[in-house]
Swiss-Prot record:
<keyword id="KW-1003">Cell membrane</keyword>
<protein>
    <recommendedName>
        <fullName>Putative glycosyltransferase CsbB</fullName>
        <ecNumber>2.4.-.-</ecNumber>
    </recommendedName>
</protein>
<dbReference type="GO" id="GO:0005886">
    <property type="term" value="C:plasma membrane"/>
</dbReference>
<feature type="transmembrane region" description="Helical">
    <location>
        <begin position="231"/>
        <end position="251"/>
    </location>
</feature>
<dbReference type="Pfam" id="PF00535">
    <property type="entry name" value="Glycos_transf_2"/>
</dbReference>
<keyword id="KW-1133">Transmembrane helix</keyword>
<dbReference type="InterPro" id="IPR029044">
    <property type="entry name" value="Nucleotide-diphossugar_trans"/>
</dbReference>
<keyword id="KW-0812">Transmembrane</keyword>
<dbReference type="InterPro" id="IPR001173">
    <property type="entry name" value="Glyco_trans_2-like"/>
</dbReference>
<feature type="transmembrane region" description="Helical">
    <location>
        <begin position="264"/>
        <end position="284"/>
    </location>
</feature>
<keyword id="KW-0808">Transferase</keyword>
<keyword id="KW-0472">Membrane</keyword>
<comment type="similarity">
    <text>Belongs to the glycosyltransferase 2 family. GtrB subfamily.</text>
</comment>
<keyword id="KW-0328">Glycosyltransferase</keyword>
<dbReference type="InterPro" id="IPR050256">
    <property type="entry name" value="Glycosyltransferase_2"/>
</dbReference>
<dbReference type="GO" id="GO:0016757">
    <property type="term" value="F:glycosyltransferase activity"/>
</dbReference>
């Protein structure tokens, strides 16, 4: 850790056009901030010129550091890689698409100097479609009843964390990471900073409906076992209904005699029970799959190249070329 240094982690996936823009915006903001800073780009397997744009910046600005993954490992892995390699006494996580306004950095640092370990940006839903806003609102109402942490609508990864908070996060070694939940789980003193939603100016969002749905599922499954308990309670409820139905049918037979079998009732019951069983198996399978993933102990990411001094990092292409030339001579 370096005192007086603020580290900024920027996960980047196909953000070639935005890399230099976010760099210029950060440089402008830090002219009025009395901390030194480093900008840490994490290239998450981009297929455009993101890495080259980052390299060009690093060649002219010593404050620019980067790690480039061997493939796309996802934003969670990119954030973790940043936490594991930055040197600052405080760390800011933000996106490369300019939807996280850099003017909030002053508010972040102000909150940090007031003693807060997490200064969190919370945005409104301006610019989002009605359907997305509605689904988001419903999701957060549901998830906060289901999980053991308090997740806020409009709060994402955009925040400042103290070194103490970062070190606490690094102690959490699970393979299936859900940063929103982890940030809440570690606790510490928190301050909320509100801001207006900023629409993306360049490129397109990397979040499709299916990826958002899967991310939401991660939030539900990663932080509680209530879905498993729900399967148990559902089973008890259906068992009680079945007993009541059997007793009612038996009484009806005793009073009215045996009637023609109710095929509709039988088919409905079979389909209903089949659906409940498949849903329960799906929930159980999700948990078992995560346990299986955890037992593999695979690394969260693999680094292809980087410009940070670390003996455990692979050689960059430039260093490889220099080594070959040295051997030839």
């Amino acid at each position: 850790m370096k005192q007086g240094l603020i580290s900024i982690i920027i996960p980047s996936y196909n953000e070639g056009y935005n890399v230099k823009l976010i760099h210029e915006s950060l440089k402008k903001e830090f002219k009025n901030i009395h901390y030194d800073y480093e900008i840490f780009f994490i290239n998450d397997g981009s297929v455009d010129d993101t890495l080259q744009q980052i390299k060009d910046l690093a060649a002219t600005c010593s404050r620019v550091k980067y790690i480039s993954f061997s493939r796309n490992f996802g934003k969670e892995a990119a954030i973790l890689a940043g936490f594991e390699h930055v040197q600052g006494e405080a760390v800011i996580v933000m996106d490369a698409d300019l939807q996280h306004p850099t003017y909030l950095l002053k508010e972040f640092i102000k909150g940090y100097e007031e003693g807060y370990d997490q200064v969190i940006a919370q945005r409104n839903r301006k610019g989002d479609s009605f359907v997305r806003s509605l689904l988001s609102s419903m999701y957060y109402k549901f998830i906060n009843k289901a999980v053991e942490v308090d997740l806020r609508d409009g709060v994402g990864d955009f925040r400042l964390l103290s070194r103490q908070a970062v070190n606490a996060l690094l102690k959490l070694s699970e393979g299936n990471r859900f940063s929103k939940g982890l940030f809440c789980w570690i606790g510490f003193d928190q301050k909320i900073v509100f801001y207006e939603n900023v629409e993306r100016k360049n490129g397109t969002s990397k979040w499709s409906f299916s990826s958002l749905f899967n991310y939401g599922m991660d939030g539900v499954v990663s932080f509680n076992h209530k879905p498993l308990r729900l399967c148990f309670y559902t089973g008890i409820f259906i068992l009680l209904l079945s007993i009541i139905y059997i007793i009612a049918t038996f009484v009806k037979i005793l009073t009215n005699g045996i009637s023609v079998p109710g095929y509709f009732t039988i088919i409905s019951a079979v389909l209903f029970l089949g659906g409940v069983q498949l849903l329960s198996l799906g929930i159980i399978g999700e948990y078992i799959g995560r346990i299986y993933y955890e037992t593999k102990k695979r690394p969260h990411y693999l680094i292809k190249e980087a410009n940070i001094p670390n003996k455990d990092l692979p050689e960059t292409n430039e260093l490889k070329s220099m080594r070959r030339l040295t051997k030839m001579h």
